[in-house]
């Protein structure tokens, strides 16, 4: 049986966002489920926009999500191989020279659109005479090269979309070699997939027309194309997720928002499938349940609040042994098991545990708030006797209402401020048992 090899091929021209991390996750999971390999390739032929800092950030995000790769390489290291295949395809008459300037191509595109026609290249360069070609050369124009698409049916069985069919005549022939001699993604990707024995490619459905063209490239190189799967696009408020849209970058989710790696991995691995989105604790367990056939053809709606809810579900499922190393990573190694189990149900982000610790162990300085000292003194006098429990808050506030007549915000806000120094935060009912009874009275009477 052929060994399954998948790949993830980001361009280091920006940060990873939720759309392409989903492709990375699914390629990794598919490979691991079938005891295959996962390759990380950097499509860095865009010299102007590719940056080392983006490459480093992409690797950091993948490592954070435990998407370890078996091999990695970048396209710039393979230029001599691309030249070899370029010459082969030129000999086969599957590449042809074009001399239009970017401005001329844009005028053609606008004219076609104004007539209600699809912006497909008109193959004008195929009909150039030697005299016309020589004239362009004398003008100093350098040719770019397009791949010649055969005008015939193209079809494949897609892992997600099922049977997909294209008419070669409906496809615009892509530029594969720029005027400066550098090569674009389209052909380089095919050469890499052949040389690295890629068997399966899972990517966004915005690549479907590229796949149709690349299938002809594989065939032109006498190679059977890999098996393709095209994911429906993720949308948020009726907008496609773009690489350049802020707020959906993985770095933002993990660093600024503070979400757990397995919450992010679980959510985006299952989003758009028929499987229930659950917080898995390991990539191995996630891979075991993974089924590419469960993914829908319809657009997938991404609601950030759903991801944050899943993060909460993951946190409340973690035992102390499962989280103590993570606590060290956020400099909260002082948290013990008893404290973790007490505050765990109220955590939205792991870093919230540090806020809880500070609330419970540091007497806040609230002198400047000018709180009602008489009211707080009355509240201290009716604090339930004995050990403070989760039920103490409701018992206490009922008694406070009986003696003061206060209710709602008028009742609880002064108590929250005196006890925590904050207007918002964890439920006071949950905070009380973590503070000594004597400390509660001290905070109320010294405010």
Swiss-Prot record:
Q: Which GO terms describe its molecular function?
A: ATP binding; glutamate-tRNA ligase activity; tRNA binding; zinc ion binding
| Taxonomic lineage | Bacteria, Pseudomonadati, Pseudomonadota, Alphaproteobacteria, Rickettsiales
Q: What does this protein do?
A: Catalyzes the attachment of glutamate to tRNA(Glu) in a two-step reaction: glutamate is first activated by ATP to form Glu-AMP and then transferred to the acceptor end of tRNA(Glu).
* Keywords, sorted A to Z: Aminoacyl-tRNA synthetase, ATP-binding, Cytoplasm, Ligase, Nucleotide-binding, Protein biosynthesis
Q: Cite the PANTHER family for this sequence.
A: GLUTAMATE--TRNA LIGASE (PTHR43311), GLUTAMATE--TRNA LIGASE, MITOCHONDRIAL-RELATED (PTHR43311:SF2)
Give the residue ranges of motif 'HIGH' region. 10-20
- Motif placement: 'KMSKS' region: 240-244
List the InterPro entries hit by this protein, alphabetically. Answer: aa-tRNA-synth_I_cd-bd (IPR045462), aa-tRNA-synth_I_codon-bd_sub2 (IPR020751), aa-tRNA-synth_I_CS (IPR001412), aa_tRNA-synth_I_cd-bd_sf (IPR008925), Glu-tRNA-ligase_bac/mito (IPR004527), Glu/Gln-tRNA-synth (IPR000924), Glu/Gln-tRNA-synth_Ib_cat-dom (IPR020058), GluQ/Sye (IPR049940)
Q: Name one Pfam family in it.
A: tRNA-synt_1c
Q: Name one GO cellular component term.
A: cytoplasm
Compartments it resides in: Cytoplasm
Q: What is this protein called?
A: Glutamate--tRNA ligase 1
């Amino acid at each position: 049986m052929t060994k399954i090899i998948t790949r993830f091929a980001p361009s280091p021209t920006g940060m990873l966002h939720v759309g392409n991390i989903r492709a990375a996750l699914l390629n990794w999971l598919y490979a691991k489920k079938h005891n295959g390999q996962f390759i990380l390739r950097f499509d860095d032929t865009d010299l102007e926009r590719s940056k080392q800092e983006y490459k480093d950030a992409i690797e950091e995000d993948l490592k954070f999500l435990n998407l370890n790769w078996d091999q990695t390489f970048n396209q710039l290291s393979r230029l001599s191989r691309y030249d070899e295949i370029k010459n082969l395809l030129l000999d086969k008459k599957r590449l042809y020279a074009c001399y239009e300037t970017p401005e001329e191509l844009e005028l053609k595109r606008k004219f076609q659109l104004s007539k209600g026609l699809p912006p497909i290249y008109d193959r004008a360069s195929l009909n150039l005479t030697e005299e016309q070609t020589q004239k362009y050369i004398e003008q100093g124009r350098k040719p770019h090269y397009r791949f010649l698409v055969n005008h015939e049916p193209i079809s494949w069985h897609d892992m997600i979309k099922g049977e997909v069919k294209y008419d070669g005549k409906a496809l615009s022939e892509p530029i594969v070699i720029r005027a400066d001699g550098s090569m674009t993604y389209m052909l380089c990707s095919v050469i890499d997939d052949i040389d690295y024995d890629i068997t399966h490619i899972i990517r966004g459905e915005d690549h479907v027309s590229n796949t149709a063209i690349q299938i002809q490239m594989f065939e032109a190189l006498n190679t059977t194309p890999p098996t393709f799967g095209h994911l429906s696009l993720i949308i948020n408020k009726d907008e496609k997720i773009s690489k350049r849209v802020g707020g959906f970058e993985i770095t933002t989710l993990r660093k600024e928002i503070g979400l757990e790696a397995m919450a992010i991995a679980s959510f985006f691995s299952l989003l758009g499938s028929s499987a229930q989105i659950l917080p898995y604790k390991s990539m191995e367990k996630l891979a075991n349940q993974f089924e590419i056939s469960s993914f829908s053809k319809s657009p997938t709606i991404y609601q950030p609040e759903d991801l944050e809810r899943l993060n909460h579900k993951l946190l409340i499922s973690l035992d102390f042994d499962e989280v103590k190393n993570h606590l060290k990573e956020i400099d909260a190694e002082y948290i013990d098991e008893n404290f973790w189990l007490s505050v765990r149900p109220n955590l939205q982000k792991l870093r919230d545990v540090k806020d809880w610790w500070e609330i419970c162990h540091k007497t806040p300085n609230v002198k400047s708030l000018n709180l009602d000292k008489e009211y707080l003194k009355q509240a201290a006098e009716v604090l339930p006797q004995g050990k403070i429990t989760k039920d103490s808050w409701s018992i206490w506030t009922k008694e406070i209402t009986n003696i003061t007549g206060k209710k709602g915000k008028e009742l609880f806000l002064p108590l929250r401020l005196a006890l925590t120094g904050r207007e918002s935060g964890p439920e006071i009912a949950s905070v009380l048992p973590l503070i000594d009874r004597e400390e509660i009275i001290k905070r109320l009477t010294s405010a």
